[in-house]
């Protein structure tokens, strides 16, 4: 086994499995770990072959501008391109736009498109497609979550067939990173009526088959604009809700990759010399959300009490094991960010939590349901960990777990108390604007604050690094004072794959970029 370390990784023990049912399902499989046979190292890239990638959750939406789940974004990355590619270091690189420039005040951005790029249905990309894409995102009827993220755009217009200009209402120095990193900013053709039924991009693979809850088939785009790429003939993404099946498949070679394995199975993969485990630093996090517009969390005392119930270091270890992930402090800015304000995380204080609950009218504690969804490593573990902590404060939590598709359609943005998952974006501005701007479609907590809105706008407007960091510090202070979420850790992006999968570059956002990948 080799471990490709893109971030800090502990070589020590991962926390042992605490759920007997899961442990029994993996007990026999773990013994296979020592049976891997080291394959030879090929020196040149080879063309051809099919790889099988396992997801725990299943994609639901195929429209790139309204896709909600991580399974959708990661898979659609193979079908579509953005104007700009934000690479694994979060640096903007040319993609459909071969170059770009901005005015000195960063309010007007001009992108020059590549000539001869073809959509999967055969027509060449032009500026009208880019204008169509962004106007579709801006249209309230589309209900794209990216609409709030791009609220600074006053207009997008065609300059000539291969040049597009964005005029902004206010300066934004990271606009290129935003169009490259936004999950929903994938360029789509203006002449395809239903992108959910007919996903049509310019990407390295074409989507030829989608069976909800079962599999997705992607085939090589022979007309891809990057010469010689991709190398693989086909990618088959299979839906396997039981992670034990992922482990068995990787051990036997029936699978080539498991997308985002949990902390419980990482030691099993690490024990097999034919499997690589990669870990990429990420802005992603898994918050416990409290809806401030619904009881009991419409009372600030209750929100504060729940935050004081949490032992953040313990919750981090329960959710991500011994991965070297720093403790966070109930806001989206991770400790490894240059914008992070040094601070001591809120400490657990059960007695104060009890008093706050009593002051809020819950002198005998409370009974409450917490929703969590299966299919994403860490979520159920975090819910059960917090449930156990809350008992000491006489808070009796019943954890209700459902599959991701049911959670996202019936409970997310509706229930008053749940744990969810945020993939890391490529800018901190986007992380904030998507979830904490008052009018954001994905404002899970319904925490609406003009002060926060003004600060998010300040992050976007401010160009001078020191002043920008000061704005981020004010945002963090407001979260520390009255966060609508318990954010105990920022989870890295983890992939496990067979060693014969060559030149796969893990991305912090969990995207599957198979353009240069080949089978050795």
Write out the residue ranges for each language-model feature:
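Surface-exposed binding/hinge segments that line
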Residues: 112, 146-188, 209
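N-terminal lobe/hinge region of extracytoplasmic solute-binding protein
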Residues: 54-104, 135, 200-202
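Periplasmic-binding protein-like
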Residues: 268, 293, 297-336, 381-382, ...
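N-terminal secretory signal peptides
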Residues: 1-18, 28-30
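Extracytoplasmic/peripheral linker and loop segments enriched in polar/acidic and small residues
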Residues: 392, 396-407, 431-499, 520
């Amino acid at each position: 086994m080799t471990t490709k370390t893109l971030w800090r990784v502990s070589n020590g023990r991962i926390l042992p499995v605490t759920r007997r049912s899961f442990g029994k399902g993996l007990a026999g499989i773990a013994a296979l770990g020592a049976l891997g046979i080291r394959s030879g190292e090929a020196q040149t890239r080879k063309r051809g072959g099919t790889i099988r990638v396992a997801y725990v959750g299943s994609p639901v939406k195929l429209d790139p501008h309204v896709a909600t789940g991580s399974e959708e974004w990661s898979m659609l990355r193979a079908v579509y391109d953005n104007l700009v590619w934000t690479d694994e270091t979060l640096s903007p690189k040319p993609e459909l736009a071969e170059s770009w420039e901005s005015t000195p005040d960063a309010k007007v951005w001009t992108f020059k498109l590549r000539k001869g790029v073809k959509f999967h249905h055969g027509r060449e990309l032009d500026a009208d497609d880019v204008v169509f894409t962004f106007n579709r995102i801006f249209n309230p009827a589309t209900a794209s979550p990216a609409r709030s993220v791009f609220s600074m755009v006053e207009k997008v217009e065609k300059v000539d067939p291969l040049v597009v200009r964005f005029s902004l209402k206010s300066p934004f120095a990271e606009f290129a990173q935003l169009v490259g990193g936004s999950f929903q900013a994938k360029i789509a053709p203006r002449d395809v009526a239903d992108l959910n039924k007919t996903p049509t991009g310019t990407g390295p693979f074409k989507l030829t088959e989608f069976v909800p809850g079962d599999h997705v088939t992607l085939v090589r785009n022979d007309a891809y604009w990057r010469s010689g790429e991709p190398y693989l003939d086909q990618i088959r993404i299979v839906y396997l809700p039981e992670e034990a099946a992922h482990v068995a498949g990787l051990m036997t070679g029936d699978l080539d990759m498991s997308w985002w394995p949990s902390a419980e199975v990482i030691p099993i993969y690490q024990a097999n010399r034919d499997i690589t485990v990669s870990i990429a630093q990420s802005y992603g996090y898994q918050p416990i959300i409290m809806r401030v517009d619904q009881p009991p969390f419409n009372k600030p005392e209750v929100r504060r009490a729940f935050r004081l119930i949490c032992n953040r270091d313990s919750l981090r270890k329960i959710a991500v094991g011994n991965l070297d992930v720093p403790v966070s402090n109930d806001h989206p800015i991770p400790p490894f960010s240059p914008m992070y304000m040094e601070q001591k995380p809120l400490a657990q204080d059960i007695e104060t939590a009890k008093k706050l609950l009593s002051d809020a009218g819950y002198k005998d504690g409370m009974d409450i349901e917490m929703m969590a969804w299966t299919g994403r490593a860490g979520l159920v573990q975090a819910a059960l960990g917090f449930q156990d902590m809350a008992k000491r404060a006489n808070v009796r939590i019943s954890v209700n777990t459902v599959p991701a598709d049911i959670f996202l359609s019936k409970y997310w943005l509706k229930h008053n108390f749940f744990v969810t998952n945020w993939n890391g974006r490529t800018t901190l501005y986007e992380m904030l604007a998507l979830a904490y701007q008052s009018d954001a479609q994905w404002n899970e907590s319904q925490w609406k604050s003009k002060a926060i809105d003004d600060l998010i706008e300040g992050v976007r407007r401010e160009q001078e690094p020191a002043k920008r960091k000061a704005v981020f510090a004010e945002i963090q202070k407001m979260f520390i004072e009255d966060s609508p979420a318990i954010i105990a850790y920022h989870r890295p992006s983890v992939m496990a794959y067979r060693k014969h999968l060559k030149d796969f570059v893990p991305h912090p956002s969990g995207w599957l970029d198979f353009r240069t990948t080949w089978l050795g």
